[in-house]
Amino acid sequence: MLTGVMNELSAARTDAQAPAWRHLPALQQPAYPDEAALADVVADLRRRPPLVFAGEVDSLRNLIAQASTGDAFVLMGGDCAESFTHNTADNIRLKVQTILQMAAVLTYGASTPVVKIGRMAGQYAKPRSSDTETRGEVTLPAFRGDSVNGHEFTPEARIPDPTRMLDAYLRSGTTLNLIRAFTMGGYADLREVHSWNRGFTANPAYKRFESFAEELDRAMRFMEAAGVDFEALRQVDFYAAHEALLLEYEDAMIREDSRSGRLYDTSAHMLWVGERTREADGAHVAILAGVHNPVGVKVGPTTSSDDLSRLMDRLNPEGLPGRLSLITRMGAERIREALPPLVEAVRADGRPVTWIADPMHGNTITSDNGYKTRRFETILDEIRGFFEVHRTLGTAPGGIHVELTGDDVTEVLGGGEHIDEAGLAEHYETLVDPRLNHQQSLEVAFEIAEMLKG
């Protein structure tokens, strides 16, 4: 992550830049009971400093452009929904460590740079399939993330509270500061990251990765013998991204770059719109169309080629490399059938995109004992399908987007630890969707590294 200059960005916007999204359909927005309180919070956010800087955002866009041609690989990972309660230094450190470990393995497998993006420092809002939640005979507003309302199933907690956006802003800033400290202060030392991975492969459950780890060992010894300056490898660039869901918050964080006059959403380096909010004529696409950040769109199995054409027209009409990523979430059973016509249509269009696989959201199931979960092997199967499609068509598999944690939770079935349905109850902690735990995340990285080598 680069060091930004604070005075690059100003809160001022001209009348010509007034948000057009307010006149468009805005799905998945909370109904705040106190509009005056909402207006006060938005005004407060507009006066606050940016969380990220234009130079950092531009650097990320250039890296994502490299991934679109196979000259880099994007790794996006983090919580389904961040929690105010779990926004601790230890939890942040463990997530960063997990992503750094995955990146080291992927870098060796791909023989290209890995672009590290945390689904962190802002992932506090979540879309929901229903506006309400019913338990027994009680129905309350759905939990929409800590930046909107509380998770507790009480009438008071579930009332949307705009002051939570201020809390989200402050916690996002704290997270970014810690990420900068960890990744720029020696914590990301390649030798240290490699030693963590050796600890992983020493586990008999992951013995099949031992030969890969030995290759990495030889590469490290060669680098040392060749006089590589490991001190120069103690720092890495690490970026932050989240879903642009809560429109009042995102709009309040838009700033103008004094160098270029361009607008940036300074709540994150990269933002994406989800499957539920990706309408080309909707408010979420409109707000991202007006900023210069790299953006992503979640693409499910019902997406048509015409849908993608309209989204490219709205979000990247000029065809700028690195501007638009298409994050596919097809489901393992459908990706080999649904993805090829979309890839072919985009290639025929000619405007560059970066293809990123989300193997999580299309593979969610409910276990027999009532837990929302995913199967590890199904997640891997969707990743394999993603690579197979791109290899067959001669296009670049640009990256992976996974929900993960650095903790030893038990939320995803299977993997080397053989988590079964009975084991889900041991450490099931997610607020919304199930995440890969630390060991499962590394297992995914080793599997993808083998695919990248092949």
Q: Where is each model-derived feature located?
A:
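Glycine-rich, charged/polar anion/phosphate-binding loops
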Residues: 59-61, 281-284, 311, 340-342
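Non-transmembrane, aqueous-exposed alpha-helical and coiled segments at domain scale
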Residues: 323-355, 361-410
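Long, contiguous, compositionally biased segments that the model treats as domain-scale units
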Residues: 2-149
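Polar/charged alpha-helical tracts
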Residues: 36-43, 47, 221, 348, ...
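Active-site-facing alpha/beta catalytic cores
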Residues: 81-82, 86-331, 374, 399-401, ...
